[in-house]
């Protein structure tokens, strides 16, 4: 699917949705579409032995949402973003996916100078200190 088609598909689904799609879900989709290149770079950097194309599509998209939350949603504590991603992987993907998702996201958090997942209660200004990141 072309990234440029996502906004049109989202708008059509929102118009037909009953019950309505949450505002937060819409923000996540829009955020991933807007920052997909940056998000995919981060995933590729920490996906040891895997390319994005080789990952199961479900894992790839779970990771995209989690990376968006970890790096661009200071209102979401790191631990919550990681736990939710692991739960999604448990429920929607392969038996190996939860460990893969957890390991990749933990490495990303540690590698970017953010709090380790076990210690994280939020990021505060830590995200602002990431080189090349918008404040």
UniProtKB/Swiss-Prot annotation:
Similarity comment: Belongs to the NusB family.
Purpose: Involved in transcription antitermination. Required for transcription of ribosomal RNA (rRNA) genes. Binds specifically to the boxA antiterminator sequence of the ribosomal RNA (rrn) operons.
Any one GO cellular component localisation term in the record: cytosol
InterPro entries: NusB-like_sf, NusB_fam, NusB_RsmB_TIM44
Membrane spanning stretches: none
Organism this protein belongs to: Frankia casuarinae (strain DSM 45818 / CECT 9043 / HFP020203 / CcI3)
One record GO biological process: transcription antitermination
Source organism phylogeny: Bacteria, Bacillati, Actinomycetota, Actinomycetes, Frankiales
Region (Disordered): 115-135
Identification of the protein by name: Transcription antitermination protein NusB
Keyword entries, A-Z: RNA-binding, Transcription, Transcription antitermination, Transcription regulation
Molecular function, one GO term: RNA binding
Superkingdom, natural source: Bacteria
Gene that this sequence comes from: nusB
One Pfam family recorded for the sequence: NusB
């Amino acid at each position: 699917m072309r990234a440029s088609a996502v906004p049109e598909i989202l708008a059509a689904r929102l118009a037909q949705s009953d019950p309505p799609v949450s505002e937060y879900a819409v923000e996540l989709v829009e955020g991933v579409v807007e920052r997909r290149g940056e998000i995919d770079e981060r995933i590729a950097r920490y996906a040891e032995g895997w390319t994005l194309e080789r990952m199961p599509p479900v894992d790839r998209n779970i990771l995209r949402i989690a990376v968006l939350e970890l790096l661009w949603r200071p209102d979401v504590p790191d631990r919550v973003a990681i736990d939710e991603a692991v739960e999604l992987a448990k429920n929607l993907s392969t038996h190996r996916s939860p460990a893969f998702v957890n390991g990749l996201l933990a490495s990303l958090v540690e590698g970017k100078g953010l709090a380790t997942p076990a210690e994280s209660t939020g990021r505060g200004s830590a995200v602002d200190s990431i080189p090349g990141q918008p404040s």
